[in-house]
Structure formats: structure tokens, C-alpha cells
């Protein structure tokens, strides 16, 4: 599984043929910078990553350019952690959207969106998701209160199957998601450590 947060901020490069030079290999390939990954785009049902928005460098440092769209199946991760386009013909922008057959206007960007149950209970906001690099299908979404709160108490790891859809600026999930235990927070880890210490202490007392 790939984490969308792990991809954010990574530089994206596109292959380009090197200029012909005396003695150079005719098929030599160099990389040109496209930009940096800054947002994941999900399918209308919210359960599949269709690609990423890539912030492109401003022209002459002043004229802002529109984001590029990089399809989920059109890049590979290089040894240095940067991304390289692998489908030059239909891996970017309109060509990629057409190939994937996505309804662009209905696609969703979950990151930072509030999440609540179908009955209206607020769970926090969407902070991350992991997805299968071979299919684009989301495994889980991570929902928490953010900042210090998330660091202390952790996040809800909500299976994609619990996502009901989008409504009024919110991710709607199954009511059962409210019963998922928080995980990953410092308090939770401290609690686990206390529980383990308590068990060990009990065992030691029993042996004594």
C-alpha cells in the first residue's frame, strides 16, 4: 500500500530526449521537472485514487500555471524518492482523464474534509489514505482532529468500504465507524505500555 501523504511534496519528472550532441547516444533520455505532488484526486464514489494534482513552477517566477493531473498508474518512484512519468502519451491531464474514463467534475479531494457518520456524528477530518499501487483502490482513510490532538489520541482508520459518499462538504461514513478504536496516538501507546507493565507486574507478583 502507498500512503498519499508520503507522496505529497515529491518532485515529478517527465522523460525528454536529450539534445543531439556529437558522440551522444541517439536514444539517451533526460528528465525534465514537471512540478510537485500536492493533492490526491479520488473517484466519484470516493473509494479509488484516480491520480494526483501536481503544482507546476511559475513562469519566470511570477505567472502561475494551472496544476497538472498525473494518473495513478502513470508514474514510478525512483531511487531518490522522486516520481517519473511512465506513460508519456496518456498519463497526464486530459489524455489521462479520457483514458481512465473519469467524470472529472464529480471526482473528490478528501484531504482536509470533515468526516461524519450517516447519523451525523463528527469524527474529525480526513488526514491521509492508503491505496493499492496496482489497482488504485483505497484500503483505508485516516480521520482525526489534527495537530496536537491527533498526536495524543491518534486517528480513526476507516476502511474504504465504510465510505458512503460525499454530502455538503463532508465525507459520510457508516455509523459503525464511530466504534472503531483510535490508534497511533501517544496516549494510546502510553496506555498500551501501562497495560503491558501491569500484566508483567501481575505475573511477577503471582510468581512471588
Where are these regions (language model features)?
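Peripheral interaction segments used for macromolecular assembly
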Residues: 1-208
Amino acid at each position: 500500500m502507498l500512503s498519499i501523504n508520503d507522496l505529497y511534496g515529491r518532485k515529478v519528472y517527465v522523460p525528454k530526449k536529450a539534445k543531439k550532441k556529437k558522440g551522444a547516444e541517439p536514444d539517451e533520455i533526460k528528465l525534465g521537472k514537471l512540478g510537485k505532488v500536492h493533492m490526491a484526486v479520488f473517484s466519484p464514489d470516493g473509494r479509488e485514487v484516480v491520480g494526483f494534482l501536481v503544482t507546476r513552477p511559475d513562469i519566470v517566477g511570477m505567472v502561475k500555471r494551472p496544476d497538472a493531473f498525473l494518473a495513478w498508474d502513470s508514474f514510478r518512484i525512483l531511487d531518490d524518492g522522486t516520481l517519473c512519468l511512465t506513460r508519456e502519451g496518456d498519463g497526464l491531464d486530459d489524455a489521462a482523464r479520457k483514458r481512465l474514463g473519469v467524470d472529472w467534475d464529480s471526482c473528490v479531494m478528501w484531504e482536509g474534509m470533515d468526516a461524519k457518520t450517516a447519523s451525523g456524528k463528527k469524527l474529525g477530518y480526513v488526514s491521509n489514505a492508503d491505496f493499492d499501487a496496482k489497482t488504485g483502490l483505497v484500503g483505508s482513510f485516516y480521520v482525526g482532529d489534527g495537530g496536537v490532538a491527533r498526536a495524543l489520541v491518534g486517528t480513526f482508520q476507516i476502511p474504504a468500504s465504510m465510505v458512503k459518499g460525499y454530502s455538503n462538504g463532508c465525507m459520510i461514513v457508516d455509523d459503525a465507524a464511530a466504534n472503531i478504536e483510535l490508534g497511533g496516538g501517544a496516549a494510546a501507546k502510553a496506555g498500551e505500555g501501562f497495560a503491558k507493565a501491569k500484566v508483567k507486574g501481575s505475573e511477577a507478583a503471582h510468581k512471588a
